[in-house]
């Protein structure tokens, strides 16, 4: 019998919500004095540029140029994907399309060394499938995803059930991705509205950045202005927000995300500022070829003493 873990986000630590499973990618020890930065490069038409070398890049931390120690193109190295799907009542009409597109995404993007997990969120965070390399398990879990029905307005003195977008991103980063090595991406499929999260936007961004995870938002907002919530969460991590609708279907967006994940550059450097002070360090990556755009996280937090 399939067991589904459903937990309330409010008042629970990540260690309470999530337990490590045997299928989870094993943690590894890393040299904390080497900072690894993932980025993608696009031309003025949005086409991905995949033929650049180490000497084409320049990286700065807090304005100071850093010496690039390691450089690779991350086409085949292991990837971990956390997919978070909004299952609040407002998504009922698009949930079937989401299931099909996400299933094809897992079929296409996952390779034997990759892992993914699936979570649903509304006023609670539900772990539908923990870390697995099996797209079949993920598709089976997708088939069980269902929207939480709207049960009417709350009684006087009670609060309206919320869509805890920021809490979901925060808890997933802290509870599932923090101990996972290598490349990581968080895909959030939602109408983008956050209503009732305990964590603020800055808290969610900090948690995600601390795990070196890129966030991609897929927004299907039809009536509200919720897409800006996803955009504000994704861009500081080096990711993007896509609007699903007449111009692009959810499946087309997943295809773009897949291409970006397989077209990343990895740049490693030893910071000139070696202080373990826990402070935020701003990052800037440039390429020497005019007209190219680099997508990269805006910074990272130095280790603490």
Positions of predicted regions on the chain:
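Scaffold/interface architecture of coatomer-like assemblies
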Residues: 18-305
């Amino acid at each position: 019998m399939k067991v589904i873990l459903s937990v309330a986000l409010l008042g629970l630590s990540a260690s309470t919500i999530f337990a490590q499973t045997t299928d989870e990618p094993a943690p590894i020890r890393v040299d904390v004095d080497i900072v690894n930065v993932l980025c993608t490069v696009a031309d003025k038409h949005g086409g991905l540029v995949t033929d650049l070398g180490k000497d084409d890049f320049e990286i700065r931390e807090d304005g100071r140029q850093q010496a690039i120690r390691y450089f690779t193109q991350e086409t085949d190295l292991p990837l971990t994907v956390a997919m978070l799907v909004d299952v609040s009542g407002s998504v009922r009409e698009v949930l079937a399309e989401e299931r099909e597109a996400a299933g094809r995404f897992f079929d296409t993007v996952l390779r034997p060394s990759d892992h993914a997990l699936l979570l649903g969120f509304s006023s609670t965070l539900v772990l539908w499938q923990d870390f697995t390399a099996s797209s079949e398990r993920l598709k089976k879990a997708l088939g069980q995803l269902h929207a939480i029905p709207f049960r009417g307005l709350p009684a006087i003195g009670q609060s309206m059930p919320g869509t805890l977008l920021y809490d979901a991103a925060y808890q997933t980063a802290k509870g599932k991705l923090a101990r996972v090595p290598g490349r990581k991406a968080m895909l959030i499929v939602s109408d983008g509205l956050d209503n009732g999260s305990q964590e603020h936007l800055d808290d969610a961004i900090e948690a995600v950045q601390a795990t070196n995870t890129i966030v991609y938002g897929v927004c299907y907002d039809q009536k509200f202005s919720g897409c800006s919530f996803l955009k504000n969460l994704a861009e500081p991590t080096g990711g993007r927000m896509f609007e699903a609708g007449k111009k692009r279907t959810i499946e087309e967006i997943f295809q773009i995300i897949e291409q970006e994940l397989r077209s990343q550059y990895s740049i490693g450097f030893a910071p000139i500022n070696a202080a373990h002070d826990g402070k935020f360090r701003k990052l800037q990556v440039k390429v020497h070829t005019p007209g190219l755009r680099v997508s990269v996280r805006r910074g990272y937090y130095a280790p603490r003493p």
